[in-house]
Amino acid sequence: MIPTLALVGRPNVGKSTLFNRLTRSRDAIVANFSGLTRDRQYGEATHGDKRFIVVDTGGISGEEEGIDSYMAGQSLQAIEEADMVAFIVDARVGLTAADMQIAQHLRTCNKPIFLLANKVDGVNESIVCAPFFELGLGDVIGIAAAHGRNINTMLDTVLENVEPEAEASEEDKAKGIKLAIVGRPNVGKSTLVNRMLGEDRVVVYDMPGTTRDSIYIEYERDGKAYTIIDTAGVRRRKNIKLSVEKFSIVKTLQAIDDANVVILVMDAQEGIVDQDLHLMGHVIDSGRALVVALNKWDNLDNDHKSYVKTELSRRLQFVDFADLHFISALHGTGVGDLYKSVHKAYSSATEKLNTNFLTKILEFAVSQHQPPLVNGRRIKLRYAHAGGQNPPIIVIHGNQTAAVPKNYVRYLEKIFRKELELHGTPIRFEFKSSENPFAGRKNAMSKKPEHPSRRANSGGKSINRRPRPKS
């Protein structure tokens, strides 16, 4: 399970700067959810082969009324949800009473605490870090978040006991497709989970997942195995009212990362809101297959339906690869159709791609529309091969590949998606500049390549297309 690192500290010690550094200056993936304290940001970061969620807790201000004023409400919850805590102090300001109060609270959390002294650039690091040993939190790691100083060393320490992401085991595969049902509060996630489990389900067992409060529910439908990652709390303890849907951003992000396919539920009555788009952005960043379900569709009149469809076509162009379903989870309308899209997306995301066919598609794409010139020289794209699954990663080798513009990458994605018949999954491209392995041979690009779909009639070896998934 992808771990969570909470950034904690007084205002202006550099939490947001470090957050942007770790997430490569991307905006918060999820922001401004109702019920969250100001300025809390959530993002995903990588260090080598390790991935983790970063939380900029915010909301720690003032020094007069004790720890409750610094870490009220959602900030305390973020620390509670986190697997690790980075306590950031200002090396230039030095140790303050507020730092000592925060440290006193953190010592009771029973979590790994890492003390980071920020802003050590231009000063004697050992001298400015020395006072913070008084906090009793162990070693002090000096960093300069604004300039990236010691960030990699700090991450080596923080992530030392975090395991790299592992491939799915045979045991996990036997449990079937993992579905994460995600969405804003009160869009109908609980109702959809119950409807998908249905009266004809075969529930093997319900067990708490390693994600706090998420439940992994194994079941069968039409002889096929599935595991729903339930973040909505439909099976919580009886003393928690089911009408009050708990919402945890960390829990949602972890569910997305652990899933094979994500069903994003939206409320048709409210239309598309920014929070929906933020969640979609995280699904794409995570490389997960996506199915979009617009719930409560039966509550709309025809004029409202027409307006919502227009808005969908306008605002969801960046996820036009995902199937869109209009459903009523309460009455079951359209819910069964979700499974066909789930299988189609899962098959596309996990299909093994043939190197020969990928190179033929690349040759065809280049013949139809060549890459641009860079400094008077044409970018050369020579061959392609698969680099991974879930999402499909296509590695393209050539010359000057670092200069391939984004609009040409979008063109390549369109061609590869069409020829590979990939539905419901993002595609990743990796470009590598390298020596041509076919040097000395006749360049296959010197003659106009035929369309990949006509390969079977070319006299060469046919490359079978991926079989279409059965619904």
UniProtKB/Swiss-Prot annotation:
One example GO MF annotation: ribosome binding
Domain spans labelled KH-like: 351-435
A Pfam family that the UniProt record links to this protein: MMR_HSR1
Residues holding GTP 1: 9-16, 56-60, 118-121
One GO term of the biological process aspect: ribosome biogenesis
Binding site for GTP 2: 183-190, 230-234, 295-298
Chain residue ranges for the region called Disordered: 432-471
Coiled-coil regions listed: none
Keywords assigned by UniProt, alphabetized: GTP-binding, Nucleotide-binding, Repeat, Ribosome biogenesis
Domain EngA-type G: 3-166, 177-350
Quaternary state and interactors: Associates with the 50S ribosomal subunit.
Family according to the record: Belongs to the TRAFAC class TrmE-Era-EngA-EngB-Septin-like GTPase superfamily. EngA (Der) GTPase family.
General function of this protein: GTPase that plays an essential role in the late steps of ribosome biogenesis.
Protein name stated in the entry: GTPase Der
Species for this entry: Saccharophagus degradans (strain 2-40 / ATCC 43961 / DSM 17024)
